[in-house]
């Protein structure tokens, strides 16, 4: 297939061919013996004056980076750590070295030898004595003053975004540090990290539509996991008392500013604890990460958040009563609930025409958007919580909470069902919902039922969407901005 190139791209390709003709193919370079990073170089010499550096017997260093700017005999290179000014004096270098410098294009990756100097403006600079091209840029970088601002291009060509936008690079550095700190904190609390299968033959662990694939050798249908829950609870049955997994989850659902079909979650399970223990653990974990990384006061979706303040706690029914004036504690039948849904114009699907789904629909319709400060919402209806232990005081509800911040859910936690008979009945109820059109209903997982029949201690479980947490802590309103390579629609032709 014939490719078309711009005039600038053709010039660069001609430069490359000239180098090859001179036996100077930059792509034959296999490594660069760098003395240090650009940041370390700047740090090492920043406290010396221009005169001191000039009079010192300095050792030559080898640096490397991408050329991102040129002005006469000055240039700017960058590596992962920082940017650095370079200078080449035509009078004091071999003519071939100077010729190499003048032939460089913006975006080229170079190896440089030289010594430290400072300019009249006191800027640390590498006084170049030798230069070698180690990778040729055949594409033109975005103009440096305006950068790369098209959000579509930034997401599709993240590598380009990372080259030219420090803000984007810093977001992904913070993402890495957030996950590292999450792992460090859990390890310090006595948790064991485990790995569970991505391919699963039973659909369970969450309410979500799956991606489906086929295992050729076994001639069997598998799902890409929609949660790690079931496998982790089997670990609790097996005797682990604190386990977690940070891993990829796949849900074949819509995409918007807070949803991507492939995302990262952390799930953890603790034996012998209840919902309230997990609630405190959740708050402690998030606050620890935010404190450690100095991210306690982010801005998210236009709201300022103070993660240093104690998180609020409220029952779902109390919140509905507060915002709508409907007290579902007093509703005694599905029929009553349906009348209330009709009165308040709450839309329901066929499988949602029961007390529990209606309570949940009221909450999602009228309350979620009011929850700005970090708030633990507990007391979900049993019909929307098939893996959660029933509340002993009112079995229409379960011991579950979700954490909401700035109108969005960030965490979901349960007191886990450990009664295999109850769990079996919940799975059967899910099958009935599937018949009514609920394509997010769980399947009957008899292998998990059998595991529970061996005995699982009272257990608290938690799931946190890592991507959404990163969005919050880095003040990003779109999930695409915190995923290195988000899923995108095909380009318009």
Swiss-Prot record:
Positions contributing to Mg(2+) 1 binding: 402, 409
Keyword Repressor: no
Major localization class: cytoplasm
Listed Pfam families: tRNA-synt_2, tRNA_anti-codon
UniProt record, GO biological process: lysyl-tRNA aminoacylation
Keywords noted in UniProt: Aminoacyl-tRNA synthetase, ATP-binding, Cytoplasm, Ligase, Magnesium, Metal-binding, Nucleotide-binding, Protein biosynthesis
Listed EC numbers: 6.1.1.6
Cofactor: Mg(2+)
Compartments where located: Cytoplasm
GO CC, one annotated term: cytosol
Cofactor binding note of this UniProt entry: Binds 3 Mg(2+) ions per subunit.
The keyword Ligase appears for this protein: yes
Residue sites binding Mg(2+) 2 per the record: 409
Catalysis: reaction(s): tRNA(Lys) + L-lysine + ATP = L-lysyl-tRNA(Lys) + AMP + diphosphate
Single GO MF annotation: ATP binding
Subunit structure, as described in the record: Homodimer.
Assigned protein family: Belongs to the class-II aminoacyl-tRNA synthetase family.
Protein name in the entry: Lysine--tRNA ligase
Organism in which the protein naturally occurs: Ureaplasma urealyticum serovar 10 (strain ATCC 33699 / Western)
């Amino acid at each position: 297939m014939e490719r078309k190139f711009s005039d600038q791209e053709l010039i660069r390709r001609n430069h490359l061919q000239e180098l090859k003709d001179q036996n100077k193919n930059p792509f034959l370079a296999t490594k660069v013996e760098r003395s240090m990073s650009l940041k370390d170089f700047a740090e090492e010499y920043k406290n010396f004056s221009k005169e001191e550096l000039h009079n010192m017997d300095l050792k030559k260093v080898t640096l490397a980076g991408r050329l991102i700017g040129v002005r006469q005999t000055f240039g700017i290179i960058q590596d992962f750590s920082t940017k650095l000014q370079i200078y080449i004096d035509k009078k004091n270098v071999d003519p071939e070295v100077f010729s190499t410098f003048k032939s460089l294009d913006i975006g080229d990756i170079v190896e440089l030898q030289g010594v430290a100097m400072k300019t009249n403006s006191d800027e640390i600079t590498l006084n170049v004595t030798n230069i070698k091209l180690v990778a040729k840029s055949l594409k033109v970088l975005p103009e440096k003053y305006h950068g790369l601002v098209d959000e579509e291009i930034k997401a599709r060509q993240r590598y380009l975004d990372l080259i030219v936008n420090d803000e984007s690079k810093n977001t992904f550095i913070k993402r890495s540090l957030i996950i590292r700190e999450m792992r460090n904190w859990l390890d310090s609390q006595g948790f064991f990290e485990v790995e569970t299968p991505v391919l699963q033959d039973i659909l369970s662990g969450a309410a979500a539509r799956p991606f489906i694939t086929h295992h050729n050798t076994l001639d069997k249908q598998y799902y890409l996991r929609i949660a790690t829950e079931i496998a982790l609870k089997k670990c609790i049955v097996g005797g682990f008392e604190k386990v977690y997994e940070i891993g990829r989850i796949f849900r074949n659902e819509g995409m918007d500013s807070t949803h991507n079909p492939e995302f990262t979650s952390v799930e953890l399970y603790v034996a012998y604890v209840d919902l309230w223990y997990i609630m405190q653990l959740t708050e402690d974990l998030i606050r620890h990460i935010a404190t450690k990384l100095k991210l306690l006061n982010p801005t998210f979706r236009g709201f300022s958040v103070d993660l240093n303040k104690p998180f609020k706690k409220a029952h779902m029914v109390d919140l509905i009563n507060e915002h709508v004036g409907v007290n579902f504690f007093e509703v005694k039948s599905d029929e009553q609930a349906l009348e209330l849904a009709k009165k308040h114009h709450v839309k329901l699907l066929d499988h949602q025409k029961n007390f529990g789904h209606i309570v949940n629909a009221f909450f999602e319709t009228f309350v979620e958007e009011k929850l700005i400060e970090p708030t633990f919402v507990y007391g979900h209806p049993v019909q929307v919580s098939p893996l959660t232990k029933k509340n002993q005081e009112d079995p229409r509800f379960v011991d579950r909470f979700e954490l909401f911040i700035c109108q969005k859910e960030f965490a979901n936690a349960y007191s886990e069902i450990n009664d295999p008979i109850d769990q079996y009945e919940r799975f059967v109820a899910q099958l009935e919902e599937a018949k009514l059109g609920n394509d997010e209903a769980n399947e009957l997982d008899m292998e998990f039922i059998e595991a529970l029949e061996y005995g699982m201690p009272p257990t608290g479980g938690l799931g946190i969407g890592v991507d959404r947490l990163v969005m919050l802590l880095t003040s990003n309103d779109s999930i695409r901005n915190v995923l290195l390579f988000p899923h995108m629609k095909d380009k318009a032709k």
